[in-house]
């Protein structure tokens, strides 16, 4: 099973000894990059990495990503052979963008995202014994039903119609979350400076790094999106694709962790080292270690679903077929 190594202790050294890559904390505690390690995440800026370690990580096929204070990926080191060199999927991706067919792929992704939001609310209703959350979940799912009708009837649509339905669902979803949030929460604001918004943004950035790699490996262009606006340097398709997984990959662990307030500590308007370590640990363990069934009953880790469905998306685009994104099964 693929594994991830999180480096979040300031002063850690990453080096090679006898062909083995070690991450050694100032306390002397060591972690080893094993044959199963797929990803090394640096969640602190106070880390030294030797050139030999970078070379050995590449030889082992291990990606290394560096996260900023808000969780955004500020640097990435990847083996060159992880990039799919075929251009067929990308050529078809650009074609469906030009013809407008991409909107149907976008609509399916937004539909899956809304359904996953609704399922999380119903799960929270059951685990917290709060019936009103179940009602909120069905209210959110009502927006998905409207979008499903547009898709099924092949009605002419525009990005504005899809975004409008997505926004209405998001409002109902985050209004419900605000009532159970562990700290005051004004609703989802990507640049919000309250504790929960900063934690969500940090967790989403970790998810983006994994989704970005999955799309790249599948042969797609992460910067050519279907719904998010294209801008220079903006991985629009990564955002479109990752949205499907946000409720289960990030929202769920942050809202249900026994000591979730540890992930919300801030100092001078930024998440503390301990909070960043807490968020990264929760999100990465949820993605890499917790199995979830999809709507067809196939039980895998979210990491495996993310890569599998990226290949499915690339195949659907190449073969001019419909795409069914990830929808979580029974929670």
UniProtKB/Swiss-Prot annotation:
The lineage, from the top, is:
Archaea, Thermoproteota, Thermoprotei, Desulfurococcales, Pyrodictiaceae
The protein's Enzyme Commission number: 3.1.-.-
Return one Gene Ontology term, BP aspect: maintenance of CRISPR repeat elements
What function does this protein fulfil? Answer: CRISPR (clustered regularly interspaced short palindromic repeat), is an adaptive immune system that provides protection against mobile genetic elements (viruses, transposable elements and conjugative plasmids). CRISPR clusters contain spacers, sequences complementary to antecedent mobile elements, and target invading nucleic acids. CRISPR clusters are transcribed and processed into CRISPR RNA (crRNA). Acts as a dsDNA endonuclease. Involved in the integration of spacer DNA into the CRISPR cassette.
Gene3D superfamilies (UniProt xref):
CRISPR-associated endonuclease Cas1, C-terminal domain, CRISPR-associated endonuclease Cas1, N-terminal domain
Q: Which residues bind Mn(2+)?
A: 166, 228, 243
Task: Identify which top EC class this enzyme belongs to.
Answer: hydrolase
Name assigned to this protein: CRISPR-associated endonuclease Cas1
Which cofactors is this protein said to need?
Answer: Mg(2+); Mn(2+)
- What PANTHER family does the annotation carry? CRISPR-ASSOCIATED ENDONUCLEASE CAS1 1
Give the Gene Ontology MF terms in alphabetical order.
DNA binding; endonuclease activity; metal ion binding
Identify the keywords attached in UniProt to this record, alphabetized.
Antiviral defense, DNA-binding, Endonuclease, Hydrolase, Magnesium, Manganese, Metal-binding, Nuclease
Q: List, alphabetically, the Pfam families matched.
A: Cas_Cas1
Concerning its family, UniProt says:
Belongs to the CRISPR-associated endonuclease Cas1 family.
Q: Which organism is it from?
A: Hyperthermus butylicus (strain DSM 5456 / JCM 9403 / PLM1-5)
InterPro entries linked to this entry: Cas1 (IPR050646), CRISPR-assoc_Cas1 (IPR002729), CRISPR-assoc_Cas1_C (IPR042206), CRISPR-assoc_Cas1_N (IPR042211)
Per UniProt, subunit arrangement is: Homodimer, forms a heterotetramer with a Cas2 homodimer.
């Amino acid at each position: 099973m693929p594994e991830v190594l999180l480096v979040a202790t300031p002063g850690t050294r990453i080096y090679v000894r006898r062909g083995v890559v070690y991450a050694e904390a100032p306390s002397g505690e060591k972690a080893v990059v094993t044959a199963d390690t797929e990803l090394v995440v640096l969640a602190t800026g106070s880390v030294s990495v030797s050139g030999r370690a970078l070379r050995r990580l590449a030889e082992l096929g291990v990606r290394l990503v560096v996260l900023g204070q808000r969780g955004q990926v500020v640097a990435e080191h990847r083996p060159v052979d992880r990039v799919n060199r075929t251009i067929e999927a990308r050529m078809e991706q650009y074609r469906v963008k030009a013809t407008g067919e991409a909107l149907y792929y976008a609509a399916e992704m937004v539909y899956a995202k809304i359904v996953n939001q609704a399922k999380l609310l119903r799960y929270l209703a059951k685990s917290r014994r709060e019936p009103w959350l179940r009602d909120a979940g069905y209210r959110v799912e009502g927006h998905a039903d409207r979008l499903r009708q547009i898709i099924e009837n092949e009605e002419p649509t525009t990005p504005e119609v899809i975004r409008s339905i997505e926004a209405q669902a998001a409002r109902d979803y985050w209004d419900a979350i605000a009532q159970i949030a562990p700290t005051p929460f004004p609703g989802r604001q990507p640049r919000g400076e309250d504790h929960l918004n900063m934690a969500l943004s940090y967790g989403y950035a970790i998810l983006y790094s994994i989704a970005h790699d999955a799309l790249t490996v599948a042969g797609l262009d992460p910067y050519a999106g279907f719904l998010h606006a294209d801008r220079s340097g903006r991985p629009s398709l990564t955002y479109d694709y990752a949205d499907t997984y946000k409720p289960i990959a990030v929202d769920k662990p942050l809202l249900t962790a026994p000591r979730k307030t540890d992930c919300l500590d801030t100092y001078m308007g930024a998440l503390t080292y301990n909070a960043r370590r807490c968020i990264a640990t929760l999100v990465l363990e949820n993605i890499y270690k917790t199995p979830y069934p999809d709507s067809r009953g196939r039980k895998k880790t979210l990491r495996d679903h993310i890569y599998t469905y990226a290949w499915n998306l690339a195949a659907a685009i190449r073969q001019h077929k419909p795409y069914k994104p990830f929808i979580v099964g029974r929670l």
